[in-house]
Structures are given as C-alpha cells and as structure tokens.
Amino acid sequence: MSVTRRQALQIGGVGIIGAFGLAVPLTSVNAKSASQLASRNMPKPYQRTLPIPEVLKPKSTVVDPDGHKRHLYQIQQKAALANIVPGLSTPILGYNGTFPGPTIKVNQGERITLEMDNVLPLFHPQWGYRLDTSTHLHGSASLPQFDGYANDLTGRDYCKDYEYPNFQPARTLWYHDHAVHNTGQSVYSGLAAQYHLHDEVEGSILPQGKFDVPLTVSDAMFAANGSLGYNDNTHSGLWGDVILVNGAPWPVMKVQRRIYRFRILNASIARSYRFSLSTGDAMTIVATDGGLMPAAQQVTSWRHGGAERYEVLIDFSKYPVGKRVELRNLSNKNNVDYDFTNRVMAFDVTDEPVDTSGPGARVLPTLLAPSTTMSLKASESVKTRRMRVKRDNDVWTIGGMTWDEVVQSGYRKVLADPDLNDVEIWEIENSSGGWFHPVHIHLVDFQILSRNGQAPLAHERGPKDVVYVGEGETVRLLMKFEHHRGRYMIHCHNLPHEDHDMMAQFSVGLDTNDVDPNHPVEAVRPHPISQAAPAQGTAEVQPPQTSTRPTEVAAPVTTTPVAAQPAPAPVPAAVPAGQKDVVAITTSRHRLRKDMTFSGTSKYAGSTAATSATVVLYDVTPGRASTRLGTVKANSLGAWTFTAKPGPTKQVTVVKAQSNLGGTVTTSVRTS
C-alpha cells in the first residue's frame, strides 16, 4: 500500500522530524537548523548568481470569431531534478520541469488560452498522495471554471485549457497548484511561477525589461540525500532553514547604479517575512497585489505574508561601485528562524555602464495611478459581513466553515452571496495569539479600510487580494463583486492551514437553486492530452515555442527531467483499449458511531462513459484485514458520494477507492 499523505506527515516527510511539532501558538523560535544535510552539502549565503526564470512564448496564435487574437500557450507539469544544494540533486515538481516555472508576460487585453498538461507521476514520489492538479492564476478575475477551483482536478495524462482575458490593470500575478488538500506540498515541491500583466500606464513610468526583475522567495528544508524535507508542525506551518530566491539559495545579483524594479512574491507555504536593506535605506513600494498604488510609499521594512506581491523600487545610484547591499529578513513573531533565515539575497553594485534608456531609470515616482478599487467608498457598501479565522478541534476554519462542508453540500454551501456589482465590507477577525493568516479572496481586488481600527500600514495602501491578518488583529476590507457570476474560494494562504481545512466559498449573483453555467467543476472538464480541445478561432501564425531571458543574468536553476512512474495495473473491466479511469477521493471522513462519508470523482477518458463507472470502497486501515465498505456509481458528471450511518464499528483510518474501469487511489480518513 502506498504511503498516504497524513502518514507522510506523521513521519516527517522524508525523515525530518520537527522539533516544534506541537499544535500550540507560536511567538518566535530560534533554532540551529532544520535540514539534515552534511556540512559540505549545506548551501551558504551569497555563493550563487540569481537565476531569472525563462519567459514563455506562445506556441501559436489564433483569431477568435469576434476578430480578437488569442495566444495559445502550453505547459507541462512534470517531475525533474534540480541543482539547489551543493553536490546533490533535489527531486522537484515543476512547470516545464523548472523551479520556479517560466514567467508568462502579457499585455492588457491580450486573450490567452493556457493548456496545462499533467505528466506528473501518478503519486508524489516522496509523500505518496495522488498528483491530480488544479491550476490557479492568482490575481486574475477568471471565470470560475478557469479559476483553479480546489476540486476541479486534472489527472495524470490529462490536460485542461484555461482561458485568461487579461482585462485588468497591470499587476504581478502568479500561477500555482490549488489541488484540494495537497496545495501546500505541491507548491512546496515547485509548482509555482510568476505571471506579469502589463499596460500603458505602468509601462510609461516603471522600469522595464532586464530592470524589471521577478523575485520569488520561498524557504525549504532538506534531507541528507538532498531531497526536500516536509514537516508542517501538526498542520501549523513549515519553516525551512534555507531561503530560496528564484529557486537558488541566498543568491547574488549584479546591478548597475540606477533604479531597479523588483516584483517580490512570497511563495513560502507558511513563512512570513519583514524585508529590509542592510544599509537601512528606504525602498519605494509602487504596487501591491492588484497593481499600482495611488501614491508610492517609502518604507525601510514591510511585513510580507504568503502569496502577497509587492513591486519595490531600489535606487542603487546612491551606492559606490563595489558596494554589496543585502536584502535582509527581520522576520515576524510567528516564524521559526534559523542561523541564516535573516538573509535573503545580495546586490553587488558594478562599474558596468549605466543604461538610462526606458522609463524609471533615474527618478523615483510619487503619484502613480488611481484605481477603481482604491476609489471605492465605505458608504457604497450594501452589507457588512463578519467572520473569524481560527483553529477548532484540530481543523482550521474560516467564518465557522470548512472546505469539507462545501464538498458535502454538493458545492452549494457558501459563506457569502453578494449580488453582481454589490459593494460590501468584510470584517475578518483573528483572535489567536500565535498564528497569522494571509487570507486570499478570489475574483476581487479589495481595499484595506482599517487594521484594529487604525489606518492600513503604508505598504498595503493599494489594491489587494491577500490580507495579512496578524495575531490579535481585525481587518476591514472593502470590495466590489464584479465581472462574473459564480462560485469562488476564500482561504488562508498559509497552505497547511488551507489544506486542513481553512477554505470556504462565496457565490456572486447566484440564487441557491440556480443552474450555474459557470460551475467551477462541471462547466469545463479536463480531456486526455492526446485529444486536444479544438482552438476557438482560426489559425493565424504558429511561431516555435521558445523562451527568452536577459543575457546579463544567470540561467535558471538546472533541472533534469525524471520519467513518470507507471500507473498501477487496472482491475479487469470491459474498457476500450488504451482507455482507463482516473478515480480521486476529495472527501473522506468516518466519525465512529456517527457517520461515514466518502466522495470523489471518476474521470473516465472522454467522460461519456462516466455513468458506467462504479467505485468500490475498501477499509485498508493498517493492522487489520482489508474489508469492503460498499459500492457507488458515478453520475453523468463523474461525481460519486458514498455515505453510511453509523458506519463500521471500528474506526476507519485509511480507505481505498477502486474503479471498475481501472484505477485506484488510497488516502487517509478524517476522524472528526
């Protein structure tokens, strides 16, 4: 039997047992190390050059029926080996096999379709969970069926075509995996990358090209063999002892004596940062998650939670040639810190001739651009909603709701139901003393009205889609629910919190019994990679899919593809040759002497045979013989649910689902 996700957590991933594995609130912890690397393999600060991810080019362009062009992109999610620590290779999951994945750059109004191919192993090579994926373009007002809904899963050898209209103002977005209950481990394994949306306004006032630099910051711990270690401290969070920027430990970047623009993404799955310069000088924040701020903000440090993006200008003209300026991490009280987690990367000022062409080379801007989000007034709100984020019986909740409740309701239960174009105030309270929660609201940009009754901090006075809700803090947010009707998620972006089960949903412009044409799971289904979906328009040009990157910077972290492991043999069934079911479990719960519920999906190739899929459930709890629990048929959409009251008299802790059309999956069972 394969190792289940929760079993992997119990043994600390790949042999790394956390010293702080109690579910108690954190204040601040300092420790020597988390990794088990030999000293010769432990990376040291400032030994590597900053890698810059490749820029992905479209594989073709078509013309939509209305005459607008649409660029078609393709990415493969695949396993690879990365050169991160000295002398050893690290297995990763990556978009096109790189860590982080390629950057996508588009102009406002350019439509794209992104074909996301899942060619990952069937199960995670280290942690044993099934590698079904769901891709979320974080920061995009996408239709629900293209938003990366947690249960909109794409199995191995399948793909999904995501449509992005890119009508919003310029901003730094990122795309990452959002698969239910496994987002943290998949993002930690490498499924994350930046996505830049440009427009004429930012293009005329901010540095561009090689002076517009993505910095994807994350942290990790490593086993002795160089593989990633994973310990989420009883679902509280993971804090590694190695800081990575664009996949490299504590890198160095050579800079000219001019202004640079840095797009800083916190891609850590739990760690927060408080960035500052070693010189103590101020930096200029010009954009937040949702784009340009109304006015630039000068700060010497700022608090940066998971998934937040800040665009920061640093003026290196004030420093002499040969000066090293370090980007430091002053940290926050909710972290576990180690010897070198106070360092992030370094900039070395060179005597290279200064390129002053293009905007923003010499003058720091003050006034930037108004936005509809920041122009909203609290008086426009038609409703105020209040919700708390907290831990309850070892499960993280938001507004008193868990994601399991959403699934159990058939995706109907919602935390809020604003009408289309409604303006509302959401008040989010975190009364805990030791956990912070970076709360992400899909679809919308919002304005932070207040934090504990005071004005928002200087660095967050721009349009946001993630809000840092610190210990003992209450924030008030103002937002307009526009663009699309449908269901969208709200969750904590401390990903172990999200995975255990701090996620809910809201609906926009839907009544309870409405037929939803934009259903996030049912409207657009994945299809086999070999059966590509037809293009929407007519072919115009088909350039080769190449990548570009500035020659002045280092290549991305070296990766080597790893062959996907073979799928398990299908059970005997009358199935057309070459076709096989992909069965997934999305909910598994057995409350002893109360009830038992399992639900999931059947993704039989082509989906037309979904109604012929029958799923058999087995109790495979370790220490006793396997027992058949029951049988359930998938519906026409491939969904299935099995319930029993009160259920078996012995606690089920591990369950296996097996399809008569081939394919099995094993997972742990929630007992509360």
List the predicted regions and their residue ranges:
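N-terminal secretory signal peptides and thylakoid transit peptides that target proteins
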Residues: 1-16
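Extended terminal and domain-junction accessory segments
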Residues: 10, 18, 22-74, 78, ...
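Histidine- and aromatic-enriched segments that form or immediately flank copper-ligand environments
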Residues: 71-198, 205, 271-304, 324-337, ...
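Short coil/turn motif common to extracellular beta-sandwich-like domains
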Residues: 108-111, 256-259, 421-423, 591-598
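Histidine- and aromatic-rich segments of cupredoxin/plastocyanin-like copper-binding domains
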Residues: 142-153, 221-369, 456
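Exposed aromatic-hydrophobic patches
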Residues: 161-164, 311-315, 476-479, 639-646
